[in-house]
């Protein structure tokens, strides 16, 4: 960070109790995972706060983020692709705002808690035979 030309704009905040406010104040969220992960809660939270995510095509990230609609998906270990995606959103306010709205809508419609519970119950019923 100290060698970065943007060091004055990089903030390490440590432990905080106002994470929602900090998340909502961000322009872009970036999760540059290189290996498989599930549905990252940090991505979901960013999307709920209308912060467009830049994620890599690993694990559950592409399931959450519709590339070019609710965020940007780049190949893993593609530092230049990540930088280009962040810069694209940084330079285009309208696109950033549009993707932020689409991100929140995606979480609100495709990943509702109620639907997840119903799908989980249906899966259990399918996997576990009925004793009757």
Residues of each region from the PLM?
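Active-site donor-binding acidic/aromatic loop of nucleotide-activated sugar
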Residues: 7-15, 22, 72-73
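Short alpha-helical segment that forms part of, or immediately flanks, the ligand-binding pocket
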Residues: 20, 38-48, 62-63, 69
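Acidic donor-binding loop of glycosyltransferase active sites
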Residues: 24-38, 51
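Short hydrophobic faces within alpha-helices
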Residues: 45-46, 54, 82
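Short hydrophobic beta-strand element within catalytic cores of glycosyltransferases
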Residues: 52-55, 65
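Conserved acidic donor-binding segment of nucleotide-sugar-dependent glycosyltransferases
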Residues: 67-68, 72-79, 88-93
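Conserved donor-nucleotide binding/catalytic region of nucleotide-linked donor-dependent transferases
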Residues: 88-105, 109, 130
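C-terminal alpha-helical cap of glycosyltransferases
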Residues: 113-132
């Amino acid at each position: 960070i100290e060698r970065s030309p943007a060091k004055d704009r990089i903030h390490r905040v440590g432990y905080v109790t106002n994470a929602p406010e900090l998340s909502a104040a961000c322009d872009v969220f970036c999760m540059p995972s290189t290996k498989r992960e599930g549905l990252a809660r940090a991505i979901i939270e960013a999307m709920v706060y209308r912060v467009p995510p830049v994620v890599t095509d690993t694990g559950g990230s592409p399931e959450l983020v519709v590339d070019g609609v609710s965020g940007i998906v780049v190949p893993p270990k593609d530092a230049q692709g990540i930088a280009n995606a962040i810069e694209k959103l940084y330079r285009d306010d309208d696109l950033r705002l549009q993707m932020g709205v689409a991100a929140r809508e995606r979480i609100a419609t495709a990943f509702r808690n109620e639907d997840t519970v119903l799908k989980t119950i249906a899966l259990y019923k399918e996997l576990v035979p009925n004793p009757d």
